Regions:
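Surface-exposed molecular-recognition determinants
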Residues: 2-130
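Positively charged, low-complexity/disordered segments
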Residues: 131-135
Length: 135
């Protein structure tokens, strides 16, 4: 049986220095879903998030669940300015590198809200699952 790819890589970037933002543009609307995999270095006072279609208005709803192995917590908001992958409420001041995997369902649809599920490991002691949607 021949190997087949589950995903097609349509864009990548590797930064040579710190950057406040990265833009992926001209993503074709021919796919159903997108998967964004990020390796991000942040501190406890920095949020990591992204916008869909350059929309930075308070058009995003988020539900966040996180834990550190001995305790759990959750938070939500209906008026966020981005699809945040994390919230700045860590137990240490330097988090280090964090891996996030975001699944963006039906991203090209114009007839429904965008739903994004992001899972992350904050490089410290917190693990997170986050459900985001745009409205």
């Amino acid at each position: 049986m021949a190997d087949t790819l589950t995903y097609n890589i349509i864009a990548t970037t590797t930064l040579g220095a710190n950057a406040g933002s990265v833009t992926f543009s001209s993503i074709p609307g021919t796919y159903t879903d997108l998967v964004l995999v990020s390796n991000v270095a942040t501190t406890s006072s920095t949020n990591f998030g992204y916008y869909l279609n350059n929309d930075s208005a308070n058009n995003y709803c988020v539900v966040n669940m996180y834990g550190n192995g001995s305790s759990t917590s959750s938070a939500n908001s209906t008026t966020e300015g981005a699809l945040w992958a994390n919230w700045s409420n860590y137990t240490s001041t330097t988090v280090g590198n964090s891996i996030y995997i975001s699944n963006i369902q039906n991203y090209a649809s114009t007839s429904m809200y965008k739903t994004v599920i992001t899972r992350g490991d904050f490089g410290g002691d917190r693990k997170s699952t986050r459900l985001n949607s745009s409205h």
